Amino acid sequence: GCIPSFGECAWFSGESCCTGICKWVFFTSKFMCRRVWGKD
């Protein structure tokens, strides 16, 4: 399966985001799936 946008993810895990990439989100202090274009 894949992780939906804004789902919590781990860059070191084998999971992949449905759309976008797994990146650090400062205001949540977590890694989350975000769209590459920066417009979620």
Swiss-Prot record:
Signal peptide boundaries: none
The species this protein was found in: Heriaeus mellotteei (Crab spider)
Reported modifications of this chain: Contains 3 disulfide bonds.
Cell compartment(s), UniProt: Secreted
Disulfide bonds: C2-C18, C9-C22, C17-C33
Main localization of the protein described in the UniProt heading: secreted
Protein name (Swiss-Prot/TrEMBL): Mu-thomitoxin-Hme1b
Family: Belongs to the neurotoxin 19 (CSTX) family.
UniProt note: domains: The presence of a 'disulfide through disulfide knot' structurally defines this protein as a knottin.
Function: Blocks the Nav1.2/SCN2A, Nav1.4/SCN4A, Nav1.5/SCN5A and Nav1.6/SCN8A sodium channels. Shows a slight preference for the Nav1.2 and Nav1.4 channels. Reduces the peak amplitude of the sodium current and negatively shifts the steady-state inactivation process. Does not shift the threshold potential of activation or the voltage corresponding to maximal current. Does not change the reversal potential of the sodium current. May act on site 1 of the receptor.
Extra remark: Negative results: does not inhibit the sodium channel Nav1.8/SCN10A.
Highest taxon of source: Eukaryota
Gene Ontology MF terms in the entry: sodium channel regulator activity; toxin activity
UniProt key word Heme: no
Acyltransferase is among the record's keywords: no
Keywords, comma-separated and alphabetical: Disulfide bond, Ion channel impairing toxin, Knottin, Neurotoxin, Secreted, Toxin, Voltage-gated sodium channel impairing toxin
Tissue distribution: Expressed by the venom gland.
One GO term describing the cellular component: extracellular region
